[in-house]
From Swiss-Prot, chain A:
Gene: acpP
GO BP, one annotated term: lipid A biosynthetic process
Subcellular location: Cytoplasm
Keyword set, alphabetical order: Cytoplasm, Fatty acid biosynthesis, Fatty acid metabolism, Lipid biosynthesis, Lipid metabolism, Phosphopantetheine, Phosphoprotein
Organism of provenance: Gluconobacter oxydans (strain 621H) (Gluconobacter suboxydans)
Sequence similarity: Belongs to the acyl carrier protein (ACP) family.
Function, in words: Carrier of the growing fatty acid chain in fatty acid biosynthesis.
Name assigned to this protein: Acyl carrier protein
S-S pairs: none
NCBIfam families, A to Z: acyl_carrier (TIGR00517), PRK00982.1-2 (NF002148), PRK00982.1-3 (NF002149), PRK00982.1-4 (NF002150), PRK00982.1-5 (NF002151)
Lineage: Bacteria, Pseudomonadati, Pseudomonadota, Alphaproteobacteria, Acetobacterales
Length: 79, 428
């Protein structure tokens, strides 16, 4: 697992108060990890802060799973 | 028809919850209160060195079993950062009260007949302070999505209703230091009018932060003379009093329509015996000469008490904040009780826990119920030299054993808002 994936996972565990084992790549923040719409807003802010990236609102809306987040951030970092 | 008047529906208290500078827990707070303990100490929530007032009544951290605050016992860790501390404290008191009452709605009708009215004087002040720092540092886009719901005063009522599924009236009072009494009084009326059968009501406050203390300091409201001797700082009616001591905490009661409580065999602490309100129309922070607003609030409480007179009232829990206004309240109580003042006892429990602002009236109403139950009047600490004499026994220093059937509690708030509530022993 990449450093980015590790860090994303850690942020999700911390913000949603879920067990690490549940934070699989396919886990949906809302359907599987108990987040509500405000939690996902906060989560995206935490990603922005931790990785020094800007995630515009239309992109943020498409980040539904752990993998979505990792992929988006990796792409930004590679660019 | 007996008891309180409207529609013949009587309202009793079937659950109590307290978070105070003396303890987390209604009974432990009461035990320490009547032992004469003080919950006042040097401020540790932030460094108060820059401010003239440096003492306050802070809720102690520690294991729940020892009366300390262990937040995770009340609010799940992942939800804690979504709420200001005043919501934490309010929920801790409300959960105690609900569990104490044993009330669990079983069906949709029950849920819809159960409401919440828990207010606060100030709300999420620390959250607003932190949020404004985020914005002023150019990070407005980083402001938490939980900023607004963390600061809003009615969110204790909101969170509690979500936790238990209470779908009845969901409301919150904001009347500064009269909030707690207004919440209990207004909620009891919702029950009398049939809007609900059960109401969870009270107040919470957590304003011991730099902004809160600085603000009350600027208003010249806080004591500054006893920074080196905190337990002596709150001294209602004493000639050396020099301002109030800020406290934090929460008081919540479960109010229930009498027949509803009887049907389920609930434990009954006492009955709401009367409730009255008034406005000063005088000044934003100072009461009028003779505290005629307080007089009218007490008179209004008696008017709808179903026939009680001043001769029936055994104990007054005074607003008594340890400010110059103490003697104005004393004037009003003496005038109101007339000859009956001679047999009255009155104390100010703010001498032990400080002034809990929007929570004060609710916590003090609970003390009245405990005084009725146990036949003990809590003391006024530090009343060494009364600024003026009175025929009223103000219970200096030590608690008194005394049969109390009817108690009255006063709360007055900035803006010139006054409330009095009567609690009485339940008799079927």
């Amino acid at each position: 697992m990449s450093d980015i994936a590790d860090k994303v996972k850690k942020i999700v565990v911390e913000h949603l108060g879920v067990d690490e084992s549940k934070v699989t790549p396919d886990a949906s923040f809302i359907d599987d990890l108990g987040a509500d719409s405000l939690d996902t807003v906060e989560l995206v802010m935490a990603f922005e802060e931790a990785f020094s990236v800007e995630i515009p609102e239309d992109a943020a809306e498409k980040i539904a799973t752990v993998k979505d987040a990792i992929d988006y951030i990796e792409k930004q970092k590679a660019a | 028809m007996s008891g309180t008047a409207t529609n013949g529906r009587r309202v009793v208290v079937t659950g109590i919850g307290v978070v105070s500078p003396l303890a987390v827990g209604a009974e432990l707070t009461w035990k320490r209160l009547i032992e004469g303990q003080s919950g006042i100490g040097r401020i540790t929530h932030f460094d108060p060195s820059d401010l003239p007032a440096q003492v306050a009544g802070q809720v102690p951290d520690g294991p729940t079993a020892e009366g300390g605050l262990t937040l995770s016992d009340w609010v799940p860790v992942k939800d804690q950062k979504k709420m200001d501390r005043f919501i934490h404290l309010g929920l801790a008191a409300a959960i105690q009260a609900v569990e104490d009452s044993g009330w669990k709605p079983e069906d949709e009708d029950d849920r819809c007949a159960t409401g919440v009215m828990i207010g606060s004087g100030i709300g999420g002040l620390q959250t607003i302070y932190d949020g404004s720092l985020t914005v002023s540092s150019g990070k407005a886009r980083r402001l938490s999505p939980f900023f607004i719901p963390s600061a809003l005063i009615n969110l204790i009522s909101g969170h509690l209703s979500i936790r238990y599924g209470f779908k009845g009236p969901n409301h919150a009072v904001v009347t500064a230091c009269a909030t707690g009494v207004h919440a209990i009084g207004d909620a009891s009326r919702l029950i009398q009018y049939g809007d609900a059968d059960v109401m969870i009501a009270g107040g919470a406050e957590a304003a011991i932060c730099s902004l809160g203390i600085a603000g009350f300091c600027s208003a010249r409201a806080l004591s500054t003379a006893s920074n080196d001797d905190p337990t002596k700082a709150s001294r209602p009616w004493d000639k050396d009093r020099d301002g109030f001591i800020m406290g934090e905490g929460a008081g919540v009661v479960v109010l229930e329509e009498l027949e509803h409580a009887k049907r389920r065999g609930a434990k009954i602490y006492g009955e709401i015996g009367g409730y009255g309100m008034s406005g000063d129309a005088h000044h934003i922070t100072a009461p009028a000469e003779g505290h005629e607003g307080a007089f009218r609030a007490m008179k209004a409480a008696l008017r709808n008490s179903g026939g009680l007179t001043t001769a029936d009232i055994d104990y007054v829990n005074a607003h008594g904040t340890s400010t110059m206004a103490d003697d104005l309240e004393l004037d009003a109580v003496e005038r109101f009780f007339g000859e009956d003042a001679k047999r009255l006892v009155m104390s100010s429990t703010k001498s032990a826990i400080g002034h809990l602002l929007g929570a004060a009236g609710a916590v003090e109403a609970i003390f009245c119920l405990q005084a009725i139950r146990d036949g003990i009047v809590p003391p006024t600490l530090n009343l060494d030299n009364p600024a003026r004499e009175s025929v009223i026994d103000r219970v200096a220093h030590v608690a008194q054993q005394r049969k109390i059937d009817v108690a009255l509690s006063n709360s007055f708030g900035f803006g010139g808002t006054n409330a009095s509530i009567i609690l009485k022993r339940f008799k079927d």
